[in-house]
Amino acid sequence: MTVKANKIYDKFKKSNSSLFWCKEKKYEDLWGSINDLLAVRESLKPLFVTVTSSKKKLKALKDFCQREGLILDFKKYDASLDEKWNQFLDREKHNDNYNIFISKKKELINKAKKMVRRGFTLNEGYNSKEFGLLLGYPSCCVENYDKVNILKSLKPYTCNKILFYTNILLTGTGSNCRLASHSLCSFNCKKTIELNKKILKVFKKEIPDYYCFLIKYLKKPLLFWINGKQGNFGLSDTLTVFVFDGELKNNVLNYKKVHLHFPINTAVKLINSPSVKEIESMVKGDRLVIEKKNIKVYKDKKLLIKVKRGKQSAILVDPS
């Protein structure tokens, strides 16, 4: 089913309204960047590069770096985004856009600035191996960036088990719910697991409430639908993910609530999306019965709907 992401997102965005966000005031404007910022501060990564069109976000990053003794540099660029993107980014049509570079070493920032392509936007990524290594990504992930598509390792019609340390599926409108910020070579990548364990230790000390939220949320069972290209960059624009507050036993998932994650660009078309009726039924329901070709959604003992599974639809993952 093809639908506009913004139509579904507007209808169901309240489903995620209670999702935890950092209560620490110094982090409240750093949505989606905390893991990378703390990784650079703790020398777990040498460099963090991001992009924003928000002067508020730029100021928050400057304040953080000044407070924590990090170097920040930025470079303006001209991005010709359409009106839907402008509305999504909540900015004026001709507002400034910034590539932002954060590190402890000025020479790394200078090197990264030379490598950045003009016109980098949320739709594009850097595919240079040299750039990936400069950012401190694991060498195995960098080497396999354009060779391995980790989504293909998650099989349809079954239950996929992964470690919560490598759960990078909760991107898009919930991209604060993650540890790794790079494309993985596999869900069992030892170097990524080691890095993310260290990042979690920093969270536990620095932001204990957020730490407790993450280790619980990243372990929740989920269903996802793949939309469009399955590239390793920008999973946030290819996945629709439903996270269940519940427990999966054998083929039955009993749950109390559903959290919905949509592509970060809500103007995109979802070419492979559950219908509004299917979403409404899962939000209303409290139990899923997982069959090979279908998922039955129940409320109490009443069958609400059957959701078809496919090669790219309703793929079940149970992190632990």
PLM-predicted stretches and their roles:
Residues T2-G119, Y137-E143, K147-S320:
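A conserved ligand/cofactor-binding region detector
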Residues S128:
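Generic structural marker for isolated residues within well-ordered, non-membrane alpha-helices
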